[in-house]
């Protein structure tokens, strides 16, 4: 996809691994970076996304679905989950556009990731769009703890999985209360979702601290994103 910002940028898609406590692959998030035409400048999606038009967001979402289609047998063979971020602007389109809905619904291993800044998230199941999405697709709250939402949507059972925000984790990790605080979160949230995951695992030391705390999966700089050509390496030992 080509995005028109101060200059033209093209999207490049990668797979961000999510591991279990034994460092076995359980799933992959499809993420995008944006590179200038000359390749000299690269920007992550979170910096570019606020400047993308609805049409550009739609094109990026479709591009991710197309990539997923090319490697769906890899996900099925290895029983992996795929996560795609769902921008708020695409939510209604996904429910209203039958072709887009069908393209996303064909993947039984696909889950849609939603951020805490999703409009009306604090309404929980009273948010009609969010409730309808949860009826048709497994949802993941991708950055719980970023400070932009309450726990209502979680306790309403809208999310199959919840991922703790990486910045939240890295700030808390510096405190001596990190372990008991994480145990408290696990105890509070686990009954409201199928899987509670943790981001911000950038080192072996951090992985060793987090692994015994009751989380089902882990994500971070310890397992960097890879292009589609390197997917097979993630399941080799």
UniProtKB/Swiss-Prot annotation:
Keywords: Repressor, Transcription, Transcription regulation, Virulence. The keyword Transcription regulation applies. Residues 1-237 form the EAL domain. Disulfide bonds: none annotated. Signal peptide: none annotated. The keyword Magnesium does not apply. Belongs to the YdiV family. Acts as an anti-FlhC(2)FlhD(4) factor by binding to FlhD, decreasing its ability to bind DNA, and thus negatively regulates expression of flagellar class II operons, decreasing motility in nutrient-poor medium. Required for resistance to host phagocyte oxidase. Interacts with FlhD in the FlhC(2)FlhD(4) heterohexamer, inhibiting its ability to activate transcription. This is Anti-FlhC(2)FlhD(4) factor YdiV. It comes from Salmonella choleraesuis (strain SC-B67).
